[in-house]
């Protein structure tokens, strides 16, 4: 497990209310577009657990301000960064093309590698991960080992609910 191996450490959130609103607005715009175009994506938002050691194993540093346009570009099919997860810290995209250990839990056949990876990371840290299915455009959140299907119209509300959970 990551915590036992000290690959995840704790940190405090430093976002103001306005910055948090900006984060949520940018993610909502990106997820709405990714879903509409059935562009597969896995986006992890760090909460208090620092994912640096995981990123450094497989990811590509980005270190750019979060914007819907940049997320859409990263996940555009065929680009070198579109496979794997993108990790957001605060309002910055810090890494892309990060590969997570998938969950070992049995899932029904309708879930692919993105969903398994998103559940896997949520089992070992407190991050909140957004998954957009390439096949259906459906959106899910993963948090603490749970996969939560979310209609796009309810994304902002559901995201806030899990983002603010302790």
Where do the model's predicted regions map?
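Divalent-cation
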Residues: 2-166
